[in-house]
């Protein structure tokens, strides 16, 4: 497994950089991730400790999410996809626990593997491809929802970073960004900064963010609850972010037309 493909200086990895770089140097990163999970007291929704185990320990008679819910064991392969999954468990344990609980609840309701339903699909989208869009002003979220790309992203990068923060969550999204390309688009979960202020005024607390997001998703949600954001459009996250860059309608989709 080659960790050299990960450029930890990428701005979208800032919240994962310290622990991720440390874990990547371990001779057995899966065991190291389990040790960190134990130190931090990570559990699933039934209070079983989270342990990262080899993929071949997953029985053929049970699905991945159901197994995590039943045992606390997270089947893990030696690849970057599962490395990022472990890293997200370590940074966002409450949200990961809640997503797994939602999956387990839906599996119990609809045991057939051929019937997933809206909730499971939405939980999978969050788990694999979500970014959290934290804004200080509701108007910024409105611009995102309306796909007003120039006003949101191009007009004033300083204003954007003063009023917004984008935190990547989806482990498949993180894996795709190892080899970035312009059209990579996240399913965005919006929330307001005033719910997240730590004791150090104005600073975003990642553990508090985790708890707030877990509480928000707990009642359930569907894929229509997401907004969409081409990740390399975040100001400063890619080169050449000029008018032509954001005018590419195949990536930065125009606002939906509403019928009169």
Describe the residue ranges of each PLM region:
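A contiguous, surface-oriented mixed alpha/beta subdomain in the mid-to-C-terminal portion of proteins
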Residues: 108-260
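N-terminal ordered "arm"
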Residues: 1-49
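Short, hydrophobic/amphipathic alpha-helical patches that form generic packing surfaces
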Residues: 10-19, 82-94, 124-128
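Long, hydrophobic/aromatic-enriched structural stretches that serve as scaffold segments
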Residues: 42-92
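Eukaryotic complex-assembly regions enriched in large gene-expression and RNA-handling proteins
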Residues: 62, 97-100, 121-123
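Short, glycine/acidic-rich hinge or "gate" loops at secondary-structure transitions
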Residues: 97-109
């Amino acid at each position: 497994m080659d960790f050299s493909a990960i450029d930890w200086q990428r701005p979208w990895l800032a919240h994962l950089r310290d622990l991720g770089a440390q874990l990547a140097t371990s001779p057995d990163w899966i065991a190291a991730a389990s040790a960190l999970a134990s130190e931090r007291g990570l559990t699933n929704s039934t209070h079983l400790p989270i342990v990262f185990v080899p993929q071949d320990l997953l029985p053929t008679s049970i699905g991945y999410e159901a197994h995590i819910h039943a045992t606390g064991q997270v089947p893990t392969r030696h690849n970057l996809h599962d490395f990022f999954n472990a890293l997200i468990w370590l940074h966002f344990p409450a949200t990961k626990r809640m997503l797994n609980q939602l999956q387990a609840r839906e599996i119990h309701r609809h045991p057939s593997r051929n019937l997933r339903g809206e909730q499971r699909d939405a939980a999978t989208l969050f788990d694999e491809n979500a970014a959290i869009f934290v804004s200080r002003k509701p108007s910024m979220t409105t611009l995102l929802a309306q796909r007003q790309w120039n006003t949101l992203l191009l007009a004033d990068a300083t204003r954007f970073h003063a009023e917004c923060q984008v935190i990547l969550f989806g482990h498949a999204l993180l894996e795709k960004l190892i080899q970035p390309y312009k059209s990579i688009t996240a399913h965005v979960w919006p929330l307001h900064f005033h719910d997240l202020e730590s004791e150090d005024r104005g600073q975003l607390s990642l553990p508090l963010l985790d708890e707030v997001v877990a509480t928000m998703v707990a009642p359930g949600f569907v894929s229509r609850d997401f907004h969409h954001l081409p990740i390399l459009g975040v100001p400063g996250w890619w080169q050449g972010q000029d008018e032509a860059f954001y005018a590419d309608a195949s990536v930065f989709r125009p606002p939906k037309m509403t019928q009169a």
